[in-house]
């Protein structure tokens, strides 16, 4: 995501510091301390401007949401939305998703959302796709058996490629569709999703569940 740099970014970020976690690695194994009564802990990777994040958090106040975004110009908009809505169940991480496994204990997250990530269409950039096996292994590390990923995109080639990666890495695929909103809008839409849907672009979605056969990241991979 490319956004225009804003001169007032730092003071705006500072005003949102109560819902931003500055040292997420220190929270591994302790995320529920932010909301002990939480029914679930969910993570959104690449939350962008936060429409999906805040609307889902508002709809499910008994769930703790952790939103990750490395583009600060986008994340500040998401945080400001959360504060304006008075949400107490969503926190933000200013970081790259590639560091996810270092920030969560094994099995600490119940569900991970991947919404409209960059498709990186060129083959030489495949490793940057958020459904590349090295990312899937980290998600599996943070999820318990039966935990899952909800993946949405408007990019059919990326979706089909991702289905192959999920299957090859031992994930169980469920509720796979190449036209999610064919019979009417389902669930909370992202900002991008609303635009694509209005243009008649089919939205692809699937759920991938962690099984005993799912490949899982190990800390030794960092040392290799």
Which sequence ranges carry the predicted segments?
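Conserved beta-strand signature within the Rossmann-like core of class I S-adenosyl-L-methionine
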Residues: 146-153
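Conserved beta-strand/loop positions that form the S-adenosyl-L-methionine
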Residues: 45, 68
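A short glycine-rich, Lys/Arg-flanked "PGG" loop and its adjoining helix->strand segment in the class I
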Residues: 131-145
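S-adenosyl-L-methionine
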Residues: 1-43, 51-58, 79-106
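Conserved glycine-rich SAM-binding loop
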Residues: 48
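Conserved SAM/SAH-binding beta-strand->alpha-helix loop
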Residues: 71
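Class I S-adenosyl-L-methionine
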Residues: 164, 169-224
């Amino acid at each position: 995501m490319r956004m225009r740099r804003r001169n007032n970014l730092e003071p705006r970020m500072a005003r949102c510091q109560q819902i931003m976690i500055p040292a997420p690695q220190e929270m591994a194994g302790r995320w529920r301390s932010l909301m002990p009564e939480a029914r679930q802990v969910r993570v959104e990777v690449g939350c962008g401007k936060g429409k999906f994040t805040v609307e889902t958090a508002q709809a499910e106040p008994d769930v703790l949401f952790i939103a990750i975004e490395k583009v600060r110009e986008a994340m500040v908009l998401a945080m400001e939305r959360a504060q304006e809505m008075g949400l107490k169940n969503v926190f933000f991480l200013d970081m790259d998703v590639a560091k996810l496994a270092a920030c969560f204990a094994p099995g600490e997250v119940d569900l991970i959302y991947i919404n409209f990530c960059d498709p990186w269409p060129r083959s030489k950039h495949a490793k940057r796709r958020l459904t590349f096996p090295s990312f899937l292994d980290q998600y599996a590390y943070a999820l318990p058996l039966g935990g899952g990923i909800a993946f949405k995109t408007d990019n059919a080639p990326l979706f089909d490629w991702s289905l192959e990666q999920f299957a090859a890495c031992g994930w169980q695929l469920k509720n796979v569709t190449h036209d999610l909103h064919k019979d009417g809008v389902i669930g909370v839409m992202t900002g991008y999703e609303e635009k694509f849907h209005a243009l008649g672009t089919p939205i692809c979605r699937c759920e991938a569940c962690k099984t005993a056969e799912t490949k899982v990241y190990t800390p030794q991979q960092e040392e290799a």
